């Protein structure tokens, strides 16, 4: 009798394990799989539909000194960049580009290297931000440059530099993907009036990963 009870108990445990595969040691629970449903008395997982890729995302490979553009998960342009030096490294992590600045003015940040620097107006040839700026982690950003020879090198104080022609094209794409579309007259104006700063906030910030 005791042997029969033991066998029945082991059988019940085995059945219990069979109907609950969604709660294993790897954490593949019902929450991660999606919803749950009951079928024939057993709890089963309903597969979750993967979230779609954002309209646009950026990745920066600091070692390769490259910026990669993705549209809806598909690879687009690969652009050369300058990154921070060993002393002033570019911060890694995941961020969101929330603002595009055309013809940015440069205000020296409150950091040791900029203590004796002076501000540079929009459009000034000595302005280190170039023609456009993508803000993701103030004061650091992706921006143009007045030193195109630095592209492909570790040369900045933490920001990511691009050639002016590249940042202008990328800024337009970021605005469109971020829900801040403008017509061609807007872009003609900001390129023509280089001494006038234009700030555009993005309703849908564009994700960027720096590694």
Placement of each model-derived feature along the sequence:
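Bacterial N-terminal signal peptides that target proteins for export
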Residues: 1-7
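Cell wall/extracellular polymer interaction/catalysis modules
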Residues: 21-110, 119-133, 193-198, 206
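Short amphipathic alpha-helical segments with coiled-coil-like heptad repeat character
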Residues: 2, 75-76, 168-170
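Exported/periplasmic cell-wall-interacting domains
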Residues: 22-23, 46, 111-211
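Residue-level signal for mature regions of secreted extracellular proteins and peptides
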Residues: 11-12
């Amino acid at each position: 009798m005791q042997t029969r009870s033991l066998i029945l108990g082991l059988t019940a445990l085995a059945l219990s394990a069979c109907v609950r595969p969604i709660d294993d040691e790897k954490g593949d629970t019902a929450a991660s799989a999606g919803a749950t449903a009951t079928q024939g008395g057993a709890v089963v997982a309903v597969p979750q539909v993967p979230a779609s890729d954002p309209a646009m995302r950026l990745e920066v490979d600091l070692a390769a000194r490259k910026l990669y553009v993705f549209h809806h998960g598909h690879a687009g342009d690969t652009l050369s960049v300058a990154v921070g030096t060993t002393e002033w490294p570019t911060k890694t992590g995941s961020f969101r580009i929330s603002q595009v600045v055309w013809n940015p003015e440069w205000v020296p940040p409150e950091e040791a290297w900029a203590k004796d620097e002076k501000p540079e107006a929009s459009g000034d040839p000595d302005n280190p931000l170039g023609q456009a700026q993508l803000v993701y982690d103030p004061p650091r950003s992706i921006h143009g440059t007045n030193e195109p020879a630095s592209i492909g090198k570790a040369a900045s104080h933490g920001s990511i530099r691009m050639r002016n022609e590249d940042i202008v094209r990328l800024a337009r794409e970021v605005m469109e993907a971020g829900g801040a579309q403008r017509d061609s007259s807007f872009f003609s104006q900001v390129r023509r009036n280089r001494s006038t700063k234009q700030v555009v906030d993005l309703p849908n910030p564009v994700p960027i990963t720096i590694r």
